[in-house]
Amino acid sequence: MTDLNELKLFATTPHPCSYLDDRDATTVFIDPEVSVDQNLYSQLTNYGFRRSGKHIYRPACKTCQACIPIRVDVETFTPNRSQQRCLRKNKDLTVTVVSTIDTDEHYTLYAKYIERRHSDGDMYPPKRDEYRSFLSAQWGVTKYLEFRNSENSLIGVAVADQLKNGISAVYTFFDPNEQKRSLGVYAVLAQIEWAQKQSNRYVYLGYWIKECQKMSYKTLYKPFELFINNQWLTFI
């Protein structure tokens, strides 16, 4: 097992926060020269790190602790009424786990999603090379959950990394025209179900930010755990 205390970390200079407009952010990255495998990646995820492409990072802001790592305990998870409705609404969908999404069909859906939902974000305009590098990991732990309707049309994809004790939800994109399906919610529920089928314990959802609406939804999947003061605490 790799000694995490021996890993080199590189910190960015303070920069405008992507989630809270009135704050600056500092991010630490794992040395890109480190050889990463599933064991090390799982350890780092358990300590609150995330992946973006080949880079593994964690917030390290001096004056703010708003980004809190969150994970769902799939052994005790129970969907609430709204989530149960979402499951019923999407019972016609077929979920398939695949090993690659480097196809025109998948990229077209991704580009449509970015153009319609995130035209003000860092990934706009969509580019295929960035699509490839952002969503996949060089150490080969990434899988993709496809969502197809009864006509076999691709309407959503959840990108997830397989860990030793669970899965890490990396990114989700879907057809913006299917808004009534609540596919963002469905993608989390599908990943929880996938983890359960694999006898995994957790689904890591990244960072919960109470003051950021687009990140605060993560506490709706209960019970959940938050990584506070270097320990995971359960909230029911």
UniProtKB/Swiss-Prot annotation:
InterPro entries: Acyl_CoA_acyltransferase, Asp_Glu_LeuTrfase, N-end_Aminoacyl_Trfase, N-end_Aminoacyl_Trfase_C, N-end_Aminoacyl_Trfase_N. GO terms for biological process: ubiquitin-dependent protein catabolic process via the N-end rule pathway. Keywords: Acyltransferase, Cytoplasm, Transferase. One of its GO terms (cellular component) is cytoplasm. It is found in: Cytoplasm. It catalyses: N-terminal L-glutamyl-[protein] + L-leucyl-tRNA(Leu) = N-terminal L-leucyl-L-glutamyl-[protein] + tRNA(Leu) + H(+); N-terminal L-aspartyl-[protein] + L-leucyl-tRNA(Leu) = N-terminal L-leucyl-L-aspartyl-[protein] + tRNA(Leu) + H(+). Its EC number is 2.3.2.29. The keyword Acyltransferase applies. One of its GO terms (molecular function) is leucyl-tRNA--protein transferase activity. It comes from the Bacteria. Functions in the N-end rule pathway of protein degradation where it conjugates Leu from its aminoacyl-tRNA to the N-termini of proteins containing an N-terminal aspartate or glutamate. Belongs to the R-transferase family. Bpt subfamily. This is Aspartate/glutamate leucyltransferase. It comes from Saccharophagus degradans (strain 2-40 / ATCC 43961 / DSM 17024).
